[in-house]
Structure formats: C-alpha cells, structure tokens
Amino acid sequence: MPAKFLKRSFAILFTGCLLMAFSFCSCKKIALLTGGQSALEQYFADNVLNRDFVVDFASDTTSDITSKYTGYTFVLAKDTSFYSGPMTATRNNITYSGTWQSNNDYSKLIINLTKPSIPDKFVFLNRMWKFTKKDPPILKLAPWVITSPKVLYMRRL
C-alpha cells in the first residue's frame, strides 16, 4: 500500500511540475528555443509578409475613399523580426516607404508610411489598426482605439 501511494504521489507531483513549467514558458519562447516559429508567426509569414496587397475598400466615416488607393500595391516586408519591418506603397514606379509593426498576437497593425513626403491620402492609412478579420486573401481592419466608422480592407494579390 505505501509503495502504491508513493507512486501515485510521485506521478501527481511530476505532472504538476510539468504543468507549472509549461505555464511559465510561452509557446513563442519554446519555438524560439527549439529554433522554430510559433503558429501565429508562421501564419503571418505565409499569408501577409512579403506579399502584394491592394486596397479593396476604404471608408472614412461615411465616405468611400477606395478610389484614392487605386493602382497602389502595398507590401509588408519581413526584416529581422516577425513583428515589424519595412513597408512600401508603389504605383506607376513611384514608391513610398515606411514601416509596419504588430503585437505578439497579431491583433494590431501599425502603418507608418513616411518617405519621401507622403501624399495626404496616406494620412488615413498611417495609424494603429486592429484586425477585425484575417481571412486571406482579405484582411479587414478598423482603428485600434477610435470607435469612428473607419474601415480598411486589403486583398492579397
């Protein structure tokens, strides 16, 4: 009886220690330690990074401003991180550049196109966005904090 009790106690203690160890170590850290990517990083890399996107729909309050972005191709490039990097907007061989940034669960996207001086139409794009839907080829975005009815849909080519 005591041996059976000790085996059961050891099994419970061992399981508890494993659960505690995993709770202190995130999936991202485990992926980094093993040299791999988290599932979110892989999904974002496969479906968003280094891909061409166009604006399918843009609405600023009640105005449809989609036509302002006709002909532009947008690329969020992967640099050294899965969470930030360079971004470009190109139309007729004219390229505007800047940066993009996201948080660790990819719920936020910060767009900052700055060079050379940006056209007024990009002021709408340069903000903190939240993903309302990531269903490639369509990315649906709304302002991160502001509850105004601004909407941006980008489609992967």
Region spans (language model):
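Lipid interaction determinants
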Residues: 27-95, 105-157
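Acyl-CoA/ACP chain-elongation machinery
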Residues: 100
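Sec-dependent bacterial lipoprotein signal peptides
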Residues: 1-27
